[in-house]
A protein has these predicted regions:
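Thiamine diphosphate
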Residues: 85-175
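Short gly/pro/ser/thr-enriched loop/turn and capping motifs at secondary-structure boundaries
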Residues: 21-22, 43-45, 72-73, 97-101
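Short coil/turn segments at beta-strand junctions that form active-site/ligand-binding loops
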Residues: 9-11, 61-62, 87, 166
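Structural detector of well-ordered beta-strand residues that form the stable sheet scaffold
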Residues: 13-14, 37, 64, 90, ...
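Short acidic, glycine/serine/threonine-rich loops at helix termini
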Residues: 23-29, 49, 76-79, 101-106
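Active-site diphosphate/adenylate-binding microenvironment
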Residues: 1-60
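A short, small-residue-rich loop immediately preceding and capping a beta-strand
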Residues: 60-74, 89-94
Length: 175
């Protein structure tokens, strides 16, 4: 509901929210006209560079990049490119502090903890030691950033980011 109310018309949405975004296309069906670029395979880490490409290809249109924390780390340097090229990209990083999509894939092939994946293997899917701070990472590359923990805070942060052109990052802490 937050995106439907706030997404600017003609936004290009780049969606790599693998475990938290399954219903987003349907949820934004009533939003102003926009385009949706989404993950079509199993690879992760594509959303940040794809958002850069979308912003360069259509500089008159805002870009909303929906990314997860684990995937973002594959191509985090794209934030620097966003600043360097003065691209109008709002990046929302869903921070669930884990490679949840990889946990799901382990379950799909029957390799859960009880059936084979040991504690060491499962610990490799955890992103809390150390916990990544995307607000500081973004700031270090020159991207204005905020951290949010509620839907209301997310709405406020989206209003802030959409109000001015240029790159912005919102780290959304997921339960």
């Amino acid at each position: 509901a937050t995106l439907v109310a706030l997404i600017p018309e003609q936004t290009i949405v780049v969606d790599e929210s693998n475990t938290s975004g399954f219903l987003l296309p349907q949820a934004t069906a009533g939003a102003p006209a926009h385009d949706w670029l989404t993950l079509t395979g199993g690879a992760i880490g594509y959303a940040l560079p794809v958002s850069v490409g979308a912003a360069i290809a259509a500089p008159e249109r805002p870009v909303l990049c929906l990314e997860s924390d684990g995937s973002a780390m594959y191509t985090i340097s794209a934030l620097w490119t966003q600043v360097r090229e003065r691209l109008d990209i709002t990046t929302v990083v869903y921070a669930n502090r884990a490679y949840d999509i990889l946990r799901i894939e382990l379950q799909r092939v029957g390799a859960e903890a009880a059936t084979g994946a040991g504690p060491k293997a499962l610990s490799l899917l955890d992103l809390t030691s150390p916990t990544m701070d995307f607000v500081r990472i973004a700031g270090g590359m020159g991207v204005p950033a905020r951290r949010v923990g509620t839907a209301e805070e997310l709405a406020d942060a989206l209003r802030w980011a959409f109000a001015e052109t240029g790159p912005h990052l919102i780290e959304a802490i997921m339960p």
